[in-house]
Structures are given as structure tokens and as C-alpha cells.
Amino acid sequence: STAKPESAVFGIVDKLLADGAPNVIKRLKMTATGVSETNEEPTILIPKRMELLLYPRRFKVFYGGRGSGKTANVVSYLIEKARFRNSRVGCFREIQNSIKESSYAELVDEINRKGHTQEYRCVDGEITHHTTRSKFVFRGLWRNITAIKGMAGLTDVFCEESENISQVSWDTLIPTVRAAGSEIIIVFNPNKETDPTWTNFVEPYIDKMVDGIYQDDDIVVVNVNYVHNPWFTEELKQHMNQMKAVDYDRYLWVYEGLFNKRSEEAVLGGKWQTLDFEPSPEWGGPYYGIDFGFSQDATTATESYVEDLGDGRRNLYIYRDFAKVGLEITDTP
């Protein structure tokens, strides 16, 4: 058999209907020159928020929290693209000590799920399409500069967990990917605002984004979260709500895709919530604590109680607290 001139049909879905059926608002095919609309029935479904993944761009950046379907949709796109066009795909992350730490398993699972097992050869950590000769390779970028520089000819690059990719790695990888029409797909959950991936690929465009999307002839940047995923699972929703209740800062980072404000030095970082309560007679306390502040440090005082939950677990309740900068010791309440 020979390679096809166009891809299968992608259905763009904005929501699920009451009966659970996807509401397909557009049907698209990838072609040799771009993307075209069709009336044919789709065989691949992707959320509306990820539609720009299908259109040619040098850089495609998708960032946000867990449950958005970022990685799953990129995997579907790359597998289908390799079925109709000869592709040499590099799947990278900053550190990859073994193939188990790569996206290899996700790609193989997608091949099996779509029933393409006869088309692909998946052996020894490499994936090859029998007809198009497309090939997927998996590497870590860190301390691998020579190997990466030797990968000239890559047509597609998929960078996962890109929040961890260093400036040195970007400076090595980007010039290596120089084939005509080559694409670099960057997927990540933001961590710190100083991370190179953020400063290179999102920060320059953040003020130009409209409804979380920026695009020009060279780059598309999309903020995508669980609210944009019609197939956000009930299990993930339960996990999200649990995290939101007990560890709000972590919830904002993991699911809302905001910066990680947690400090590992904070003993109770993310492990607190604000509630209305009255101390119970069974609780230990009251315990009073004070920390005298100097210069710009606040003087703080607390009245606390401890609830013994058993099994070595305890809840700490802060009933009253006070904090003020520039407080004279003689004025301490």
C-alpha cells in the first residue's frame, strides 16, 4: 500500500450532549498543504480548544493544568500525521533515564486503541510506520547535547513536561529542528515564572492573548485546562475537588495551571483551610505562641488548639492570630 494524500477526519467537539454524545461542530482533514474542512464522519475527536494543533506552525505551545487532555490530543495528532505523511518525530523531555519515563507507552496505547497495530512496528523503544516509514524516537535532553545535535532531519518534535526543560536544552534543540515545515510541539504545566519554557514561549505573548489564545504565522500559544476538556472524567473531578478542599494552593497549580506558589520550606504549605469553628473541650490547649519581628518582619501571636485524631494524626486549629509590622515590644497585645 502507499501513503494517503490526507489524514483521517478530525471531529472538533465543544461539549457532550445530554446523552453523552459528542457535539461535533467542525470536521477537518490534514492535507499536504494544510487543513481542509469536510462533511465526512470523523474518526478522531479532539476538543475545540485543541483545534489549532492541526494547523501548520513552527511552534505549537499548549500549557495548563491536569485533566485538559493536552498530551492525549498531541499523541492522537502525531500518530495520525505519521500515517499519511513521512515523519521523523523526536519525543523529548529534559531527563529520561529509561523508555518507561517517556511518552512511548502513551503512543503505543493510542496505536492499539485506534486499531493501527498492523500499520506500526513498536519494538525496543522505537515506533515505525510500515508504509510511510515514519519513525518516533525518544530521548532525554539533559547531558545529551551531542546526540540531539545528530538528529538532523526531524520533522516533528514533541516536548513533554516542558516546564523542566533548561535554556541550554532549548538552545541546542531548536536549531537542530530545521527541516522545511518542521514543528515543535510544547506541552507543559507551568511551575515557576522564571522557567525558560515560560519566559521563551508564553511570557512574550501573554498580554496579546485573546481568550487564552495567541497565534501568528510562527507560533500558536494556547492556555488549556480541564474546563476545555469535554471528556474530563468523574474520577479526576473527584480528585480535583478533594485537593481543592484540603490543599488549595496545590489545586491551583495542578488543575488550574497557575504558577506553583508552594514552598517546600513551608511546614504547612497547602495543608490548611479557613473554617468557622469553636474550640472543643476535648482538644488540647489553648497554646499561645509569639514571634517577635524586626525591621520588615511582622510580630505575630496566635492562640491554638490541637485535636488528636488517633493513629498519630492531629489537626492544628488557630483560633486567634495577630500580626503587625513595626510593632514596639511594649505595644504587643
Describe the predicted segments one by one:
Residues 1-29:
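TOPRIM fold recognition
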Residues 38-56:
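Pre-Walker A adenine-sensing motif
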Residues 98-155:
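Inter-Walker segment of RecA-like/P-loop motor cores
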Residues 164-244:
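ASCE P-loop NTPase helicase motor core
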